[in-house]
């Protein structure tokens, strides 16, 4: 069964998702070779994040121009002798193929119809200066003397020597956008006859973080068994937020030499204890030889012991240095034969179980919050004491659903304002849950009416009090005004009396 990543690998540069600038620059460089001239630089270095189409672009380019392809990747020895024999003095495709066989390499050969041969060196940034002694120096010399087009591929070009970077034309592949990945996933679903929800494809694309290869692997893992992919499928895999990176890390651990495998966890945002679970689950899938499996588990068990000592002693080097070295380099060193190549990795069973029960835990937490609000208890007590009692009561009625029992459950569910999903969780029977839910709706409506009437009565009572208070205020105001008026009258009368008793002078008689 061909993995979808290989099945839907682009056959032409036109099929490559996005990367318009990179495709244009790459095609212009290839056209110079096709016209019979030797461009300078003679090699290109395709660099960018994983899953952006670098290696696929090289094969698509060769297909467009009818070139054969000879690939050296990280699983091959890339010592000075091998590189010199393969690409050092190459001038024609036949001499290259002959040198490939003489070098004893197992390199992929893509049939074409041209005299040119494209030499592809993948994961150049993974060449180890100790294990592949002299490889980088020989590669730099081969690039400068190449008589055939050479394509180098790297995730991080800046770890390469400046001499090699100066000898190539660097072409950047940018991280893919979510919409680009969604469109590619949609085409695969349509070709495979997969039923899909648009939101599910978008969630897969977001989790991939610009890595189309990882997104396709994710889609295949979800859709191939059932023929469909829904948002619930993706939602249930909450523990898979870092799974794409984990896939890449596992690939390095099981396929790379120990020194390269050691770097597998450097950029992995995952707890080493979780990585141990992933490796333990997939050792039998990656290794077939019983001795290799035994050695791998032995290294892994030692890693687990060191990780535990970190907690006991507080010295975290046990976990993040010694344990990680054992679970990466150790497991890689357990392999004595050829690398397994592509492996369909599986998540740990315990994480899968947590993923499938995640929704149940969410429902239980939601019920506990409603109980805590209504009964004025803590959420913890609601979970431990109340929910278990409710489950017994609901399931007992579900086993023998009488009208009386359904009415009681409806009253409880209505009072707690439980949703149909929450009632179904307590009942365990969807049909009974529906009947209880209908009764609960009626109870909730009655409770709403009671609350509305109570609120209305309270409002009317408050308004009545305000009216009474207003009337009292008006009476008090009238009394106050009457008192003030009486006081003014009294003052005027007193003034008149005082004026009538004044003593007259002689001037008043003339």
UniProtKB/Swiss-Prot annotation:
Gene: rfcL
Residues that hold ATP according to the record: 48-55
Nucleotide-binding keyword on record: yes
GO molecular function terms attached to this record: ATP binding; ATP hydrolysis activity; DNA clamp loader activity
Function: Part of the RFC clamp loader complex which loads the PCNA sliding clamp onto DNA.
Gene3D superfamilies: 1.10.8.60, P-loop containing nucleotide triphosphate hydrolases
Protein family membership: Belongs to the activator 1 small subunits family. RfcL subfamily.
Full protein name: Replication factor C large subunit
NCBIfam families: PRK04195.1-5
Keyword entries, A-Z: ATP-binding, DNA replication, Nucleotide-binding
Domain of life: Archaea
CDD domains, per database record: AAA (cd00009), HLD_clamp_RFC (cd18140)
Gene Ontology biological-process entries: DNA replication
Basic and acidic residues biased stretches: 493-510
Region (Disordered) location: 459-510
Family matches, as InterPro entries: AAA+_ATPase, ATPase_AAA_core, P-loop_NTPase, Rep_factor-C_lsu, RFC_lid
Native species: Methanopyrus kandleri (strain AV19 / DSM 6324 / JCM 9639 / NBRC 100938)
Keyword GTP-binding: no
Subunit and interaction comment: Heteromultimer composed of small subunits (RfcS) and large subunits (RfcL).
